[in-house]
Amino acid sequence: MLQALMGKIFGTTNDRELKRYRQIVNKINNLESKYKALSDEALKSAFNEIKESVLSGGKSLDSVLVDSFAITREASTRVLNMRHFDVQLIGGIVLHEGKIAEMKTGEGKTLVATLPIVLNAISGKGVHLVTVNDYLASRDGNEMRPLYEFLGFSVGVILENMHDPVVKREVYNADITYGTNNEFGFDYLRDNMSYSRENMVQRGHNFVIVDEVDSILIDEARTPLIISGPTNRTLRDFKDANDIALKLLKDEHFSVDEKDKTVLLTEEGITRAEELFKVENLYSPENASLSHILDQALKANYLFEKDVDYVVNNGEVVIVDEFTGRLSEGRRFSEGLHQALEAKESVEIKEETQTLADITFQNYFRMYNKLAGMTGTAQTEASEFAQIYSLDVISIPTNIPILRKDLNDLIYKTEKEKFEAVIATIKKLSATGQPVLIGTASIEKSEILHEVLKKEKIAHTVLNAKNHAQEGEIIKNAGAKGAVTIATNMAGRGVDIKVNDEVKALGGLYIVGTERHENRRIDNQLRGRSGRQGDNGTTQFYLSLEDSLLRIFGSDKIKSIMERLGVEDGEYIESKMVTRAVEKAQKKVENMHYEGRKHIVEYDDVANEQRKIVYKFRNQLLDPEFNISMKINEIRAEYVAHLFANVSIFNGGVKEDFNLEKLFKLIHEEINLELNPADFASYEYEELLEVLTQKIKSSYDEKMSVLNDSICSEIERELYLKELDSAWREHLYAMDNMKTGIRLRAYNQKDPLVEYKKESFNLFTELVEDIKFNTIKTLQIIQFRVEDPEEEARRVAEKLDIQRKMNEASIQFNHYQSEMENESKKISRNDLCPCGSGKKYKLCCGKSGPKKGVFAS
């Protein structure tokens, strides 16, 4: 209240910033006549002078902004026949300053982006424009290409089906690169899994503009980018677990919490499951896989809905993006959940995967020197943008005032009554020819409406995840006279819905929302499809107490209001009090999701520091100039000191107390080198360390002396990389499992995040040692045929090369399965877990206490 009052008196921060931007815009406008008078060649020459002044170090990008924007606007007018409005110039300045420009639908964000893109491309370090799908990346990149090329810049577009690293590298080396968030992120991960510099495609992270920034940095931030490969988990029991899950009774055998998305087995449920599985203890080590798979089967059946969370498409379970309604082809749920869904739907159960490399969008985009974004809906998440990304949100006024009418919500008691009212409204509007766009929250609801409209013989088009390939055309035509369009979660963002004068006379595009989304931004995006660039239009939401949001989060208060007002069946209430109650429920969910995203980024920040260290060293290994032999010599000395510590030989100790027999037995076991303790009995610690290190080095040098230096270096480099990748993969497993269980420490009055940081530091120290020492051990024991060592070395190098090429091509890693001689024998905490996850028992099913189905999203 006080803040709002102060804003009215002194003006808000947003108002003050807009005032500053308008002063810069005036300077740009003052140059318009100057550049308009120039010929094309003279305009290009003027721009080249600006480029030279920046590249020579004489001027900064900020100092040439006014001239660059003025020239870009003039070039756009000539080449694209599109002139930037003043508000678009403001948007461009906001983006250049590394902020978020909130601009309403239809305000021309694609054209706005050209201003900061051109300015920042001058540096020669590359500019990335990120969009939500290939269609928009290709459309925007190619539509703006003539402008960029007129000003002397090269343009590239990264597409999902682009696999050739040579072609991709050329695209990334362009001055300006358009692409999707997924492709940029996955290319970064693939680069850091590559075994040669030739297969790496990205060249750095200078400046990025994220289109639909709220969708990418907020909505998709809960889902990390993951590259995965196969595990050795058996696929048996998924079908049996599904059958058993269906036999268990809700509330008696397990409880479901939709709000927190958890399924918990009760004591009765555990007993019943043991009877059905015919085992004595569901949580004993030998049954570890059964308890895990049953948990996933329960989630699949009671938390995940077909045509809401996923669809079955051509015999495959495909995830539906909850924010866009699009199919997420290629993505799979982890931890066996996808297999559980496949068992539920009776389709082929595919092999489970393990994480090979991952990164969150938060940490990927924070790598850029400068990050900016644009969207029509950002203010509701302004605090999150500021706290996580250090991004300010600037709301930019529309070029023409908005004439759209946003009517109050209509709330019915039941979903049936609500849909009857929606159909009546559609029939009424359709009869007049006024176009209607109906927004639904799921594929299931869009199919219900589709069937009813078919019965009513009302011509219409459906846009959901099942036909998203045509979304651009469907959305584009949604403003035509008489058009009735059903769209799930407002897929088709980035495509304008234009209306002609005849439609404007009928009242413009009418938006009908059939359900409030958990997030207000999604609702605002739906509203924003109508009334673009000063067009008229109307929006209204039809709700019921049976809607997911109201049922889970807010229906009690609203229900009591309806009862007090005496609302009869078929009647609705239209009240600001109720609308506020709905928004309060939405804020509750938004806050819950924000805490989830904050939780993810806090934990991933820990992993991210480790990731940066590992990837930095990995890139050093790939550098042909990196002296790998010197590095091997360094870690060999560390390895010998490590062996000393293992047998309690320490600096300052008495040499007579050195247990050389134990030391040399360990050396023989680890690197197959025979040594006589009597030959070393007279050495003090430092001498012993130096002599033994030299002895091990001499043994290695003698073996490798038959090879030329380049082959030696190649083998050392390939083996080091292989050990690094293998250890990093297992480290990701350990970190992921530790993160899952660390929350329990809160019960012991300990901060889980602090504990996670401590534990992860210890794990990382172990990781670094494992990589170094395993590399030394492998290099020491590797042998070549005596007849032709050069040929054998080439064969080894070629084998390594083939393996890494397979890794790069299919992201598949060799894995070995070991059968336990006796499944019921006692399992050591450091043994591999019998559930087949590939993790140590102590980090998987051996964690204290039975797992009872806590949902892992």
Curated annotation (Swiss-Prot):
Which cofactors is this protein said to need?
Zn(2+)
Subcellular location, record wording: Cell inner membrane; Cytoplasm
Task: Tell me its EC number(s), please.
Answer: 7.4.2.8
Does Signal show up as a keyword for this record? Answer: no
Give the membrane topology, semicolon-separated if more than one.
Peripheral membrane protein
Q: Which reaction does it catalyse?
A: ATP + H2O + cellular proteinSide 1 = ADP + phosphate + cellular proteinSide 2
Q: Single GO cellular component annotation? A: cytosol
Q: Which residues bind Zn(2+)?
A: 833, 835, 844-845
Q: How is the cofactor bound?
A: May bind 1 zinc ion per subunit.
Write down a Pfam family by its short name.
P-loop_SecA
Q: Which HAMAP family match?
A: SecA (MF_01382)
UniProt lists the family membership as follows: Belongs to the SecA family.
Biological role: Part of the Sec protein translocase complex. Interacts with the SecYEG preprotein conducting channel. Has a central role in coupling the hydrolysis of ATP to the transfer of proteins into and across the cell membrane, serving as an ATP-driven molecular motor driving the stepwise translocation of polypeptide chains across the membrane.
Outline the subunit composition: Monomer and homodimer. Part of the essential Sec protein translocation apparatus which comprises SecA, SecYEG and auxiliary proteins SecDF-YajC and YidC.
Instruction: State the protein's name.
Output: Protein translocase subunit SecA
Task: Name its species.
Answer: Sulfurimonas denitrificans (strain ATCC 33889 / DSM 1251)
Lineage in the entry?
A: Bacteria, Pseudomonadati, Campylobacterota, Epsilonproteobacteria, Campylobacterales
